[in-house]
């Protein structure tokens, strides 16, 4: 799409024989590109210096498409390349806040390189047709507003749609559906995400901070395959830092397989005064260090008001919300799903909220590290007979950390037998609870709200009043993002598939909240097209994950949101 020209007209390439209008006996071969508006965009015929047109190639498979025309004169071939698209600097708009550039098709994104500090809007839904795409290369410092439109079927290899995004850049209101991101050991980017590799604010020479923003960006059904890639992956952005705010973002239906990489369900890694809040991750993710929201926070980067409902897999470290925390504050989050540690060759670290919390060797810090978090996991699965530190709330923390008693080391013995001095148990956890159906992982730890195992609470006791008393704010905005219902959700979750909830069931089909009923044979598929159930007359949906399903009966097909 938009290879030849990035407007909304359809283009045609024509190879013709034509007469010279001034000499009807003089014929030439000509190559023309025209569009459905009756315009001739390109006209290559005989050239007085190069000779007759001999061959034409459309070279559209790489990152820099072009048209190659080959001329012949006196036995000498001359090649002429025309870069595509033909309107490399032509975007509607002026690039200002009042009149942003309009992005109308896939190749328009490449034109961002011409003015990366300008204002841009996505003018309509854009289908990238699963064709490998390489976006702009220069650092983007402008504003990009998706206006709620959807970019579908992105196919990215080795890097995100945008490369580096920095300074006071803002990216908002974009939906991305069914993107594919492929990575291998050959790819050298230190961090990669579907939308952007990195997003950073900054500080100018006078010490004035500039803030970057990522807000209301939603990625549905992403597939990320990264065999051999060992760096950082975040579904939306690989790495955020330096005064960056990430809020109201979601990743749903993810399928991420990156066994050697750090994997964050939403953001790969957060560093240097950034924050992530009011974000959602659902699906499954596999990596070396895995966090449902982010794989790592370096310290001073809060993660709060986030929800995860996922199956997470790792050979090293897993946290339902954060994989590895350098003592950042993680609060008012909830996690559903399962945590699964594979047959690790190192010390495995697993926590329902945080997999690993760095030790404060001084013991002087009083900063709260995990507060008002809820663990509603179905299971925490770790291999038997392996060196694993796992707890329902926090995996590894200071109570599991040690230094060697160097004064009493017997140097003739192996290191595994050297005496150890363990640090005191971490004191900076409070008000963390676990739905009591999940058994304690470590029976030696007290089940209180200040320990790594957390306190038990029954699901029926999670009233809106109790949650409000523990910092969960209810409303329909980023500062009060929670909705109380069958499960605790974020306010925007019901809007991710706008209109689906309002589908009117056709006559003869009913859904009472748990059972789908219709005359004759029924089939139900999930949003990925996988058959979930087939039955005559009725299908019970109790125990199904919340989400969008496709229902087929003998007379109709409809979409249904199962809460």
Q: PLM features: residue spans?
A:
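Eukaryotic scaffold repeat domains enriched in small/polar residues
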Residues: 3, 8-12, 67, 505-512
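Short beta-strand elements that form the blades of beta-propeller/WD-repeat-like
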Residues: 11-18, 65-71
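Structural motif
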Residues: 22-32, 75-83
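Short coil turn/linker residues within repeat-based beta-strand modules
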Residues: 37-38, 529
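Aromatic (tryptophan-biased) beta-strands that constitute blades/sheets of beta-rich domains
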Residues: 42-46, 533
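Surface-exposed repetitive/solenoidal architectures
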Residues: 45-47, 80-497
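C-terminal outer-membrane/trafficking sorting elements
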Residues: 501-563
């Amino acid at each position: 799409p938009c290879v030849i020209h990035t407007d909304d007209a359809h283009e045609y390439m024509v190879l013709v024989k034509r007469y010279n209008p001034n000499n009807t006996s003089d014929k030439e071969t000509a190559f023309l590109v025209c569009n459905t508006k009756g315009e001739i965009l390109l006209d290559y015929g005989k050239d007085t210096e190069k000779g007759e047109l001999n061959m034409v190639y459309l070279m559209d498979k790489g990152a820099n498409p072009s048209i190659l025309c080959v001329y012949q004169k006196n036995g000498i071939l001359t090649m002429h390349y025309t870069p595509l698209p033909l309107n490399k600097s032509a975007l509607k708009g002026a690039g200002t806040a009042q009149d942003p550039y309009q992005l109308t098709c896939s190749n328009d994104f490449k034109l961002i390189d011409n003015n990366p500090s300008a204002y841009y809007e996505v003018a309509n839904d854009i289908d990238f047709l699963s064709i490998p795409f390489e976006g702009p290369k220069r650092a983007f410092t402008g504003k990009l507003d998706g206006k709620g439109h959807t970019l579908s079927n992105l196919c990215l290899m080795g890097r995100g749609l945008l490369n580096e995004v920095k300074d006071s850049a803002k990216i908002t209101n974009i939906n991305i559906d069914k993107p594919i991101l492929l990575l291998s050991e050959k790819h050298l980017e230190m961090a990669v995400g579907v939308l952007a590799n990195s997003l950073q604010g900054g500080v100018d020479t006078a010490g004035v901070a500039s803030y970057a923003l990522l807000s209301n960006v939603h990625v549905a059904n992403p597939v990320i395959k990264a065999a051999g890639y060992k760096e950082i992956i975040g579904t939306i952005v690989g790495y955020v830092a330096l005064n960056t705010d990430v809020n109201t973002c979601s990743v749903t239906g993810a399928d991420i397989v990156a066994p050697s990489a750090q994997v964050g369900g939403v953001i790969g890694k957060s560093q240097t005064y950034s924050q992530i809040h009011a974000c959602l991750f659902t699906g499954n993710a596999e990596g070396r260090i895995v966090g449902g929201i982010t794989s790592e926070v370096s310290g001073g980067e809060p993660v709060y008001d986030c929800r995860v409902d996922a199956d997470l897999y790792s050979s090293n470290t897993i946290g339902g919300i954060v994989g590895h925390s350098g003592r950042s504050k993680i609060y008012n989050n909830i996690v559903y799903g399962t945590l699964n540690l594979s047959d690790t060759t190192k010390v495995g670290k697993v926590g329902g909220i945080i997999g690993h919390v760095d030790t404060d060797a001084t013991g002087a810090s009083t900063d709260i590290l995990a507060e008002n978090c809820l663990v509603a996991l179905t299971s925490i699965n770790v291999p038997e007979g392996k060196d694993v530190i796992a707890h329902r709330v926090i995996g590894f923390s200071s109570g599991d950390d040690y230094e060697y008693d160097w004064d009493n080391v017997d140097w003739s013995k192996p290191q595994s037998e050297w005496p150890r001095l363990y640090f005191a148990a971490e004191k900076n956890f409070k008000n963390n609870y676990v739905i009591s159906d999940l058994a304690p992982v470590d029976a030696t730890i007290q089940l209180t709200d200040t320990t790594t195992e957390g306190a038990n609470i029954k699901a029926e006791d999670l009233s809106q009043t109790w949650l409000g008393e523990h910092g969960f704010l209810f409303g329909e905005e980023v500062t009060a993002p929670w909705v109380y219902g069958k499960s605790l959700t974020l306010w925007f979750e019901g809007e991710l598939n706008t209109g689906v909830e309002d589908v009117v069931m056709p006559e003869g089909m009913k859904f009472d909240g748990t059972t789908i009923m219709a005359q004759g044979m029924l089939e139900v598929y999930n949003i990925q097209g996988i058959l979930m159930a087939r039955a005559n007359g009725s299908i019970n949906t109790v125990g199904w994950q919340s989400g969008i399903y496709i229902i087929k009966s003998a007379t109709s097909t409809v979409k249904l949101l199962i809460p």
